[in-house]
Amino acid sequence: MTQSQHSQSPREALAERIVEAKTRKNLTFEQINEGTGLSVAFTTAALLGQHPLPADAARVVAAKLDLDDDAQRLLQTIPVRGSIPGGVPTDPTIYRFYEIVQVYGSTLKALIHEQFGDGIVSAINFKLDIKKVDDPEGGSRAVITLDGKYLPTKPF
């Protein structure tokens, strides 16, 4: 039976255990994800408390991280989502995304509405991909693809 959390606390505590085990075992999220059949972005979000994992995927990651049966079951529960309590994020990496939305949010909204009509881009029917590419001017660039299904507003 599908279970749902009513508080972020259990999944936050599990996320701490997961990061500690990942560090202790010197694993990458990609290595932990291998064999789950899921994208590394989805599995990472689940391990950090933002998604439930299917039972098979939970078994795979629990084995790699030496998590007990209770932790494995908890990974399968529907979490209370949202990882930025208290408003504006203070972590520099997360803040840059907040800044991107502050600068480009109205532009994204205008262009989405112009191209698709009144509606939203789903964060549920959604895919995320991150790639590291060489910058022709030196260094590296992060190519981040946000791929969400468009959902039109339906009058009622």
From Swiss-Prot:
GO MF terms, alphabetically ordered = cyanate hydratase activity; DNA binding
The active site is formed by: R96, E99, S122
**Keyword Magnesium annotated:** no
Q: Tell whether tRNA-binding is among the UniProt keywords.
A: no
Task: Alphabetically list the UniProt keywords.
Answer: Lyase
InterPro entries named in the record: Cyanase (IPR008076), Cyanate_lyase_C (IPR003712), Cyanate_lyase_C_sf (IPR036581), CYNS_N (IPR048564), Lambda_DNA-bd_dom_sf (IPR010982)
Residue runs in coiled coils: none
Q: Give the EC number(s) listed in the UniProt record.
A: 4.2.1.104
Q: Which reaction does it catalyse?
A: cyanate + hydrogencarbonate + 3 H(+) = NH4(+) + 2 CO2
The enzyme class is lyase
Superkingdom of the source species: Bacteria
Example of a GO biological process term: cyanate metabolic process
The record, for SUPFAM superfamilies, names: Cyanase C-terminal domain, lambda repressor-like DNA-binding domains
Please explain the role this protein plays, according to its UniProt record: Catalyzes the reaction of cyanate with bicarbonate to produce ammonia and carbon dioxide.
Q: Which HAMAP family match?
A: Cyanate_hydrat (MF_00535)
Q: Which PANTHER family match?
A: CYANATE HYDRATASE
Q: Which family does this protein fall into?
A: Belongs to the cyanase family.
Full protein name: Cyanate hydratase
